Amino acid sequence: MALSVTPSVNAGISLHWGEHRIWCDVLHNRQVPGLSTLTPERFQSLLAHPAFQDPELLFFTHCHPDHYSKTQTRLVQQHWPGAFLALPERQEAVQILLQGEQFHLRLGEDLSIQFRRLPHEGKRYAAVPHYGALLEREGFRVLLAGDCAIGAPELADFVAGTAVDLAVLPFPWVTLPKGRAFVEEVIRPRRLLVHHLPLPEDDLYGYRPATEAALSKVQVPEVWLMDRAFQEIIVA
């Protein structure tokens, strides 16, 4: 069961899992101060990178412009027209519209994806359609939480009774005590992959050193930090 995870920038990742290649929040072109985005130069590098070839599914947790670019997504679908598109707002005539509390998708015979509507971090974003996902293949489960509010009871309900083998979470889940407690006591993953960090040149607020300092405080058997663009991590 081969699984590798490769980031683009910001929250974007590509999961290469057996014959499947899933992109989550990979394509975006709006920079938020203190974070990074997929500039035209980085976008061209991504299109040429081995980890970002022939995606099967383009999944976007939500449609904020630092997570989703319609222009880049259309270019990718022109390049790989077989890629499915799944996101929680109607953006294209042909897409998988994530709606309702939960939504299930199966890819091939061996990959199951359970999507769950989760609250976005921050009260002003409470109405934003936002979905996390649990992916399962050969009994191995991967949690993608997106920009879920830290400690959200909806996320606790989503993972209740589930053995999470890998959790992919933004860095505040490690830097904030509330986030660490939720990871250790509720999600309880066997492995933790921390992402959504800015590149060094964009780190206006010291997110990178704060996250590095906090890694040793989270009690998870294996922890990885995704802090470079196109940094491949072999999970299993």
Task: List the model feature ranges, each with a label.
Residues M1-W23, L27-V32, S36-E41, S112, ...:
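Zn-dependent metallo-beta-lactamase
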Residues S45-L105:
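Active-site HxH/HxHxD metal-binding segment of metal-dependent hydrolases
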Residues Q31, C63-K70, Q91-V94, L105, ...:
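Active-site environment of divalent metal-dependent phosphoester hydrolases
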Residues S4-P7, I22-D25, S112-P119, R141-D147, ...:
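Active-site-proximal beta-strand elements of phosphoester/diester hydrolases
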Residues W23-D25, D54-D66, L85-E89, L143-C148, ...:
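Active-site neighborhood of phospho(di)ester-bond hydrolases with catalytic His/Asp-centered motifs
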Residues H120-V186:
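Active-site-proximal loop/helix segments of hydrolase catalytic cores
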Residues I96-E109, A127, D157-G161, A181-A236:
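Binuclear metal-ion centers of metallo-dependent hydrolases, dominated by the metallo-beta-lactamase
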Residues G18-L58, K70-R74, K123, A149-T162:
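Pre-active-site segment of Zn-dependent metallo-hydrolases
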